Amino acid sequence: LNDENGEKMEKMSAIGAFEGIDITNSKALVDLKLDKPTAKDRDLLVEVTAVSVNPVDFKVRQGLKKSETPCVLGWDAVGTVVEIGEQVTDFKLGDRVYYAGEFSRSGSNQAFQLVDDRLVALAPSNLSDAEAAAMPLTALTGYELLFEKMGFIPAENANQGKTLLIINGAGGVGSIAIQL
């Protein structure tokens, strides 16, 4: 296939689903060859090096209606910026980044992913790719719970005198909420 300029499109590997069939079915998740996307506007093109699997991945896949177009799942990822859209100012080629993607775009279970630069941060240098990939969605959920839903203030000493008990905080969100 050729792009809008008549140039041959580079292909990349991905894993996707065409419908929400039982996960034990050999066609529940399939290997794909997709066109490698190109960054424009506020996009970063990230070469994905690690992803995490969240409950949302299972729920979205289970709810898929049969389609001719595959759904590439995955929201949390770590990778290296390999291309930058013309409106991006905060990142450069080679940056190691992490992010939680968005539902309106293909997910992180692919070799290269387009991500809006406003959803991206530099990955912590003290974490491996796998460790950093486990952070974005759980950290956002924990943050939103504490500071947007429960009314705590995200500033040093702003919550003195307030008490919060987190029971069974052993999962991703609970672990982050305890640390926040």
Q: Language model features by range: what are they?
A:
Residues 54, 172:
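NAD(P)H-binding Rossmann-fold N-terminus in SDR/SDR-like oxidoreductases
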